[in-house]
Amino acid sequence: MFEGFERRLVDVGDVTINCVVGGSGPALLLLHGFPQNLHMWARVAPLLANEYTVVCADLRGYGGSSKPVGAPDHANYSFRAMASDQRELMRTLGFERFHLVGHDRGGRTGHRMALDHPDSVLSLAVLDIIPTYVMFEEVDRFVARAYWHWYFLQQPAPYPEKVIGADPDTFYEGCLFGWGATGADGFDPEQLEEYRKQWRDPAAIHGSCCDYRAGGTIDFELDHGDLGRQVQCPALVFSGSAGLMHSLFEMQVVWAPRLANMRFASLPGGHFFVDRFPDDTARILREFLSDARSGIHQTERRES
């Protein structure tokens, strides 16, 4: 996987971020979600690398990145901390400004980065998510049943870690295959093996739990403080039409107050449509990124 890409471990302060870098052109950061890692992009990144310098990175707590012990206030696993990690990664690699595509937790990290560091994010694509604040504020019995793991994973340590650790494959495969609206056949075997390596690591189990603990505490508070703020860069809301998120929320309506310059796209499949439809995913991302770049250039010409 990732033939022609360079594997890097980059020190960004208190953690080290694992990434792969390949291609040439404007910088593009691809971020994964739960319960995956950077290998979710293995069949998409090469399709973008002829036009972009593509960086696929593991979030802290996932894959080959550092997995610190969670702090009592959960701040070291907040999306603010994760966004800071990834921004510093890109700056260390030589990119002050870049396009950002994030799936699931990576999309939440991207949304936070676009709020905290708007000068760094040229365009933002959020894949199959709604804002963290809305996920907690608009809970009904259907949302609670579909997203039960949000509440289980944020329980105090070490309870969820021990439950998951007793049989990690059953837990995580239940998430992956259930939300994906498909079985194991919908995933590349090499990618699945990389996910399983992560699932079986107790430090990664702890990291993902800490991620969700932050979601229900500090991330919610930060998002509440930013109600009314809009991301100004070009933005794409991209979902799987057979997924739970798409069926439970009017995604365009939910995102419209938060993204000033938004478009919407969807593909068949569930939450993990990137794995199932890499060619179509890359095509839609290329179209969005091309239009975003054209709009940025037009704005820069008007301002010069």
Swiss-Prot record:
Effect of Y147A: Abolishes enzyme activity
Complex and partners: Homodimer.
Protein name as catalogued: Fluoroacetate dehalogenase
Chemical reaction(s) catalysed: a haloacetate + H2O = a halide anion + glycolate + H(+); fluoroacetate + H2O = fluoride + glycolate + H(+)
Induction (free text): Up-regulated by fluoroacetate. Not detectable in the absence of fluoroacetate, or when cells are grown on Luria broth.
Site (Important for enzyme activity) residue list: D128
Molecular function terms from GO: haloacetate dehalogenase activity; monoacylglycerol lipase activity
Catalytic residue list: D104, H271
Job of this protein: Catalyzes the hydrolytic defluorination of fluoroacetate to produce glycolate. Has only very low activity towards chloroacetate and bromoacetate.
All copies of domain AB hydrolase-1, residue ranges: 26-151
SUPFAM superfamilies: alpha/beta-Hydrolases (SSF53474)
